[in-house]
């Protein structure tokens, strides 16, 4: 969704060619001793006297490298000390030596505009003006972005190539246009730099200047023959860039020079869509004055009004409706109106405005959901109350028979649930699967919602179409608190569904020992558990409470005379084996069970650990020690647990970090050590608590540090480094954060001052070149992975080859964009599949079925799972051995499963249960080159697995950025939770 996010690049590779990390000056404070060889320090400070004394009176070489392979000449060139540069050249310093990024001293001097140093290096040092760094960036690239016109002119006169391209295909003119220096632009064009040059993404210098808001450069480029309407690979024009970034002058110039005000990118997005999404009323008005059409729709059917309403831009919506009131009920491709979007996001003022403009309050989208369903699903009680007060029927149903109360109960929105009940919602209304709101709340373990419903009179023993009660669902889900509530309100302990199973059967089958105990103590009939479940009991209860198990076995032996001898022998052997277990082995088994319980439900796991004596008492220090000393524990579960805000969890977090030793560690080393102990949770507040404690511990352990004024600076920088790490090493992020952006993002964090530049630049280099490896446990669905690796897959409708991360697990082949992703792009069940090696394509095999289409599904661009349009899949490996290995593994997993349709439906319902909103995202352009900061904003995107900082990138329209990561999560208010409940009992 949303092609508009990638019009210009955030310098993934360009940055490393155009800017270089400043060499550390070593002495961060006047009283501190240099941490690097003093020859580098004296070179960087321009202290020619001490530098000459050192080199003349010692065996120190003028080419002595530091840890980044930078010599004194690099440092002197960067800091602009012509005297030191001249002296070092006299001492025969190598002027062509390169640092770890491939930069010569000339690149350093050029990036800072030190003309005298440039002249010395070229004329005295003999450096080639076209020398290239590791990304093919030349000194002219560096000077064009940051330096003065005099430096550019000197390099050009020295035969610097004005058409040189980086590995991203960018010329010096691209950089000068992004930097906004019209004199540099004119010099480069005069030197025959192509004014319409395109980089690897078809981005031109005009794209760069427009996005950065450099109207003088835009004017000059157009005057020199730049095409006014070039398109990048996403169909994005300079006008899109200027509009999304909010530059009126650039917009006006482009339109005056002939650009179509209603130009569209490959997804039908116009400049007006951008300004409305961003809430820029001034530019919205100007675009309309220039002829922009307010009723144009993108490929998702969304109008500018949809964009403005989704983000709550009230003034923009009022202006659009003033011009055309008939837009109020325009529907997008999913039949959603602006009121659906505003209600979904809980934008009370926007909902009120749209209702005042006569929006249809009961209008339904393609899933039969009304705005009230949307508001209820996300728990926006104020919006729900307003909609009801304005006439929305409280018991209106969607296409699956669900009312707004079903939605609130399913998603655990207790406040909204209470609001709907007070407004007259019916408690016993059933959806198409016979489920009541209480079924929904019980299925997802929302005990607070269950309590509210039961106190208001909901039938605790209501049955759905499968005759399952809420207690069946809660027991199968392992929701102990909910089970307690249901029993408290007199739920039938031994109710049987149509399968003849009681809640206890499901608790045992799912290994929910705590729930099983609650049911047994409440009087559950043990005879309802089949004899085969003795093994399940042992697995469920571990090795404790043997008497309970023996009672079950003995009772069954006396009452069931048809038990065969083998079963009796097995039970007797199991009993004898348990009696012979040594105490240590029992403890090991307990620990294993405790770990499994914790990995499934962290809080219940801790209760299990305490209740069964794994630790002596519920003491924060003991719990923290347990979490740190058992490697089998899920790092994700540890992160979720210690990140919770409850008092005890906070105490555990503090005890957990207190066990970690950061004494004498560099900042990045300490952070790496910390992040190896758990997996960062997705919720921002949890991360905040964890980083705050890390900052405190690191600062206390390093009282002699000369970098940080207080622990607040450590805290902010820790966040920033995590974002940088994700940005630098996530293959999905093509526009990487530059060093200049990293420094700019962290300016003033040290009690109002900047952290030392050499420290920050060195830190940037460490993170970019050496990824912080964060522990992860993998997707829950992929815990038993048979095979995984990179393969190349051919698309369905569009026959392109794309690299994907494949996982073979549970008779399914799943593929992801990256190994870090939580949700697969597609699922290929290996049911009745044939594997054939394709002799026409190298190392390629084909998956196909005797049916017309394979029973596979893929993740749509809006986050929903849909039927894939594949008669066959073509997949290529890197070599013959790898292909043979995959083919053999896949063949061994092919099976026949008549229930696949139900499985696919279950997965689709689950995805929709997370929700889907019908609007298409717009993301602002990302600046290609880091230069003097244009008036952009920095948006932080957090992901379950990743945190990303991008320049000028707003949240997606139509999606909600998840707190973990890098990918937007969309929501639907019209899932079928009871269908999910049914499959949960299978």
Curated annotation (Swiss-Prot):
GO molecular function terms attached to this record: guanyl-nucleotide exchange factor activity
SMART domains: ANK, PH, Sec7
One GO cellular component term noted in the UniProt record for this chain: cytosol
PROSITE patterns xref list: ANK_REP_REGION (PS50297), ANK_REPEAT (PS50088), PH_DOMAIN (PS50003), SEC7 (PS50190)
UniProt cross-references to Gene3D superfamilies, sorted A to Z: 1.10.220.20, Ankyrin repeat-containing domain, Arf Nucleotide-binding Site Opener,domain 2, Pleckstrin-homology domain (PH domain)/Phosphotyrosine-binding domain (PTB)
CDD domains: PH_GRP1-like (cd01252), Sec7 (cd00171)
UniProt entry tagged with the keyword tRNA processing: no
UniProt domain PH: residue ranges: 784-895
Domain SEC7: 580-770
ANK repeat start and end residues: 34-63, 68-97, 101-131, 135-164, 168-197, 201-230, 234-263, 267-296, 300-329, 334-363, 367-396, 400-429, 433-462, 466-495, 499-528
Keywords noted in UniProt: ANK repeat, Repeat
One example of a Gene Ontology biological process annotation: chemotaxis
Span list, region Disordered: 1-43, 911-986
InterPro entries on file: Ankyrin_rpt (IPR002110), Ankyrin_rpt-contain_sf (IPR036770), PH-like_dom_sf (IPR011993), PH_domain (IPR001849), Sec7_C_sf (IPR023394), Sec7_dom (IPR000904), Sec7_dom_sf (IPR035999)
Sequence ranges of Low complexity compositional bias: 1-28, 936-953, 963-986
Polar residues biased stretches: 29-43, 920-929
Keyword ATP-binding: no
Xref: PANTHER family: ANKYRIN REPEAT CONTAINING (PTHR24173), ANKYRIN REPEAT DOMAIN-CONTAINING PROTEIN 16 (PTHR24173:SF74)
The protein's name: Ankyrin repeat, PH and SEC7 domain containing protein secG
């Amino acid at each position: 969704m949303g092609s508009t996010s990638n019009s210009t690049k955030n310098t993934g590779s360009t940055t490393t060619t155009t800017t270089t990390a400043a060499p550390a000056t070593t002495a961060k404070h006047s009283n501190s001793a240099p941490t690097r060889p003093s020859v580098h320090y004296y070179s960087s400070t321009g202290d020619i006297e001490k530098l000459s004394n050192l080199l003349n009176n010692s065996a120190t070489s003028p080419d002595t490298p530091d840890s980044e392979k930078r010599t004194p000449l690099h440092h002197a060139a960067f800091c602009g000390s012509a005297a030191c540069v001249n002296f070092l050249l006299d001492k025969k310093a190598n002027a062509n030596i390169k640092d770890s990024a491939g930069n010569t001293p000339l690149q350093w001097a050029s990036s800072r505009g030190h003309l005298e140093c440039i002249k010395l290096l070229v004329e005295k040092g003999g450096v080639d003006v076209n020398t290239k760094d590791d990304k093919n960036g030349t000194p002219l690239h560096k000077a064009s972005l940051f330096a003065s016109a005099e430096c550019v002119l000197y390099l050009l006169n020295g035969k610097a190539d004005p058409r040189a391209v980086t590995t991203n295909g960018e010329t010096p003119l691209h950089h000068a246009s992004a930097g906004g220096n019209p004199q540099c632009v004119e010099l480069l064009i005069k030197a025959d730099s192509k004014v319409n040059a395109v980089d690897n993404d078809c981005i031109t210098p005009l794209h760069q200047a427009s996005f950065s808001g450099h109207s003088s450069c835009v004017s000059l480029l157009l005057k020199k023959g730049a095409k006014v309407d070039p398109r990048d690979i996403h169909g994005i024009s300079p006008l899109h860039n200027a509009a999304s970034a909010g530059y009126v002058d650039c917009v006006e110039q482009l339109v005056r020079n002939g650009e179509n005000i209603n130009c569209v990118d490959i997804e039908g997005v116009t400049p007006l869509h951008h300004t409305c999404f961003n809430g820029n009323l001034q530019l919205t008005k100007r675009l309309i004055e220039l002829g922009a059409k307010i009723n144009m729709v993108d490929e998702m059917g969304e109008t500018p009004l949809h964009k403005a309403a989704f983000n709550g831009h009230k003034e923009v919506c009022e202006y659009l409706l003033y011009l055309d009131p008939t837009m109020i009920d325009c529907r997008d491709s999913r039949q959603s109106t602006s009121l659906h979007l505003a209600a979904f996001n809980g934008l009370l003022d926007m909902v009120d405005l749209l209702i005042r403009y006569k929006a249809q309050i009961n209008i339904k989208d393609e899933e039969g959901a009304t705005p009230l369903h949307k508001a209820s699903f996300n728990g926006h009680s104020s919006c729900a109350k307003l909609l009801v007060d304005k006439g929305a029927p409280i018991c209106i149903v969607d296409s699956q028979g669900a009312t707004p109360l079903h939605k609130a109960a399913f998603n655990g929105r207790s406040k909204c649930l209470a609001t709907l009940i007070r407004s007259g919602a019916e408690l016993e209304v059933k959806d198409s699967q016979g489920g009541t709101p209480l079924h929904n709340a019980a299925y997802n373990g929302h005990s607070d919602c269950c309590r509210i419903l039961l106190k208001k009179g909901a039938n605790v023993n209501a049955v759905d179409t499968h005759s399952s009660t809420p207690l069946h669902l809660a027991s199968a889900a392992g929701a102990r608190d909910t089970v307690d509530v249901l029993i408290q309100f007199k739920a039938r302990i031994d109710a049987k569904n149509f399968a003849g199973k009681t809640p206890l059967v499901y608790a045992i089958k799912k290994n929910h020992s705590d729930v099983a105990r609650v049911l047994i103590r409440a009087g559950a009939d043990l005879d309802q558990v089949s004899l085969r479940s003795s093994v399940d009991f042992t697995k469920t209860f571990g090795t404790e409470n043997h008497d309970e198990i023996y009672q079950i076995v003995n009772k069954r032996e006396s009452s069931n005379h048809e038990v065969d001898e083998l079963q009796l022998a097995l039970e007797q052997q199991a009993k004898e084996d348990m009696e012979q277990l040594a105490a240590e082995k029992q403890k090991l088994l307990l620990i294993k069970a405790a770990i499994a319980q914790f990995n499934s439900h962290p809080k219940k796991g801790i209760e299990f650990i305490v209740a069964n004596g794994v630790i002596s008492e519920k003491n924060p220090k003991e719990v923290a020690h347990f979490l740190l000393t058992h490697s089998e524990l899920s790092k994700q579960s540890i992160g979720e647990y210690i990140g919770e805000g409850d008092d005890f969890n906070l105490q555990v977090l503090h005890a957990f970090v207190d066990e970690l030793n950061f004494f004498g560690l560099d900042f990045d080393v300490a952070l790496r050590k910390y992040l190896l102990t758990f997996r960062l949770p997705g919720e921002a507040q949890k991360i905040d608590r964890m980083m705050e404690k890390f900052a405190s511990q690191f600062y206390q352990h390093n009282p002699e540090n000369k970098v940080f004024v207080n622990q607040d600076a450590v805290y902010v920088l820790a966040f920033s480094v995590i974002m940088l790490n994700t940005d630098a090493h996530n293959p999905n992020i093509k526009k990487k954060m530059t060093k200049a952006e990293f420094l700019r993002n962290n300016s003033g964090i040290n009690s109002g001052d900047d952290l030392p530049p050499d420290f920050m630049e060195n830190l940037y280099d460490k993170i970019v070149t050496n990824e912080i490896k964060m522990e992860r446990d993998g997707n829950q669905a992929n815990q038993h992975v048979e095979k995984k690796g990179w393969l190349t897959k051919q698309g369905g409708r569009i026959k392109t080859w794309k690299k994907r991360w494949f996982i073979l697990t549970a008779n399914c082949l799943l593929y992801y964009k990256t190994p870090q992703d939580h949700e697969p792009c597609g699922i290929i069940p290996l049911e009745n599949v044939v594997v054939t090696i394709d002799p026409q394509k190298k190392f390629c095999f084909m998956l196909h079925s005797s049916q017309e289409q394979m029973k596979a599904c893929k993740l749509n661009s809006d986050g929903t799972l849909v039927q894939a349009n594949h008669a066959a899949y073509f997949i290529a490996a890197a070599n013959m051995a790898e292909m043979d290995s995959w083919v053999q593994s896949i063949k061994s997993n092919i099976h026949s499963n008549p229930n696949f349709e139900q499985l696919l439906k279950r997965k689709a319902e689950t995805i929709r249960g997370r929700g889907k909103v019908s609007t298409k995202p717009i993301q602002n352009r990302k600046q290609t080159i880091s230069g003097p900061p244009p008036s952009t904003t920095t948006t932080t995107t957090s992901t379950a697995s990743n945190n990303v900082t991008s320049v000028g990138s707003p949240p997606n329209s139509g999606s909600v950025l998840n707190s973990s990561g890098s990918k937007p999560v969309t929501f639907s208010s019209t899932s079928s939770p009871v269908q999910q409940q049914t499959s949960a009992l299978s």
